[in-house]
Amino acid sequence: MKILITSDNHLGYRESDPVLLDDSYDTFEEILGIAQRERVDLVLQGGDLFHENRPSRSCLNRTIGLFRRYCIGNERSGLRSNLALNFHDQNIGISIPVVSIHGNHDDPSGISMVSPIDILQSAGLVNYIGKYNLIDRIDVYPLLLEKEYRVAIYGLGHIKDRRLYRMFCEGRIVFHRPEDYDSWYNVLILHQNRIPREKEHFSSDLVEGFFDLIVYGHEHESMVVKGDCLILQPGSTVRTSLCEGERHDKYAYILRIGEECTLEHVKLRSVRPLLLDTLRIEERDNVEEKVENKIRGMIDLGRKKESLFNKEITAIDVDTKRFKCRGDSNEACGAGPVCKGYQLEEKTRIPLVKLKIELCGDEVLDKHRFSAQFKGLVANPSDMLTISRKTRRREEVETQPMAERVEISQILRKILGNVEFGVLSRLGFSESLDEFVKGDSNAFMGMVRKNIEKVVNAVDHSSIVDEDVIKAMKRASREEDRGYEEDHFEPRAALGVLDEMDPGLANKNLRNEYSSRLGGNSEENESKAKKNFNVEDLLGKEYLSKKLRKDKEDSSTDVSFTFSKYL
């Protein structure tokens, strides 16, 4: 069985740029062409297929065209699976099935939580896995595939790293394994930060040890890490930032599962070259001439490397894995298949250039002049230069540690600490604001509708009384807060918000929950906590009761009356 693995294709990246608009599509077409020529059984995509959460019509049109051209044919897939996949549809002749998870760029959003991958799945072109309802627990069931050998694929779409870490630590993510999982080749594919970052990464040490291969999307540098479990970082297929991590070659990977389990990497020829360098100028004379000569030297060197690259054949990277595809054998797997080179239509690709210039004086460089001068020679003339100045050494002063970066959602939650919310969640409100900023104009409408539906469903319509409504409103708000707080949980900040709230609104149970997470005796914390507020006093029991009874009389034919006036 052969599986092509790719990730972070970012289709639609810079599609408004007349030079770079085709880059993401050309490379993705090359990848699908490799899959077709190598006659792979499956394409496994690790998230961020699209660059935008709401891709343009042009982007969707070109993407659908590529899938139809390379994945539909007369030769039917010979795979067998436990789930209904698109190659089971007799009306669509799928020859190369594609299985994909969502990333942080194309994650589900909106009222109906729809991802661009959902659209491709509805069209019968892609099989979408790894989409879960993030409430209390995630049950990950594998996609089981058989063709001579057996593979179990566990998909986990992008989740905010803090929430994912907490859910793993609390045992709220469960991988359901088949009874004879030792006889399957177990693959986990997810879209998270792997490289350690401040509070924002997910370590493979948290994952159970029965996986043979873990595929990390999201990281743009291609990398293979050997160990008890093989870790594959396919990397991106288009350069979306001009940094050191993007300068390396880009690859597609082919996993061969059989008597010998091997992993090959195929260098992608259609990726636009990236040239990075640094220039330090200490003298004030002929500054612009030095910069111009440096850029031209970078371009000439890039052309020489490109000509050498075109003469090379594709390399292979082989890794030995213990054999777990048939029976109980634990024999070490060797390596040996030879990978072929691929002939592509030659395109003239002017390079991306990034030159960092460090000036020691007060010289002035005109970026616009260089931009006009190298237009047609450089793919990004407007942002190819980064200029910094070396400041004179000043007297040493005591440095203070940098304060932790404060996000707008934290500020908003602090402001909303004194706002009386009857049904809506304060944390849900800040989350909806983030979605609104991303471009989802219906974010607030969806939040309100979701919370009202929860209250309506929780109330017994046959014998509705004001106490039932009050309890349902309180419970809905509490459940939403509990769900949203997983993303940006800051215990001490939360206690600070409670301290600033009106004493009548300080919820003892909520404060005890935060205090217990900070450590210490819960009884001692309880004595310091504020008194529990009275929900009936908060909402105005008498006034609310009259209004509810009046609405019930006016809505005798429709018991699902509106709660909007009580929010």
UniProtKB/Swiss-Prot annotation:
Main function = Core component of the MRN complex, which plays a central role in double-strand break (DSB) repair, DNA recombination, maintenance of telomere integrity and meiosis. The MRN complex is involved in the repair of DNA double-strand breaks (DSBs) via homologous recombination (HR), an error-free mechanism which primarily occurs during S and G2 phases. The complex (1) mediates the end resection of damaged DNA, which generates proper single-stranded DNA, a key initial steps in HR, and is (2) required for the recruitment of other repair factors and efficient activation of ATM and ATR upon DNA damage.
This protein's name: Double-strand break repair protein MRE11
Per UniProt, subunit arrangement is:
Component of the MRN complex composed of two heterodimers RAD50 and MRE11 associated with a single NBS1.
Which GO molecular-function terms appear in the entry?
A: 3'-5'-DNA exonuclease activity; manganese ion binding; single-stranded DNA endodeoxyribonuclease activity
Compartments annotated for it: namely: Nucleus; Chromosome, Telomere; Chromosome
Alphabetical list of Gene3D superfamilies matching this protein: 3.60.21.10
User: Which one GO biological process term can you cite for this protein?
Assistant: double-strand break repair via homologous recombination
Q: Is Repeat one of the keywords?
A: no
Instruction: Give the family, as the similarity comment puts it.
Output: Belongs to the MRE11/RAD32 family.
Region annotated Disordered sits at: 513-533
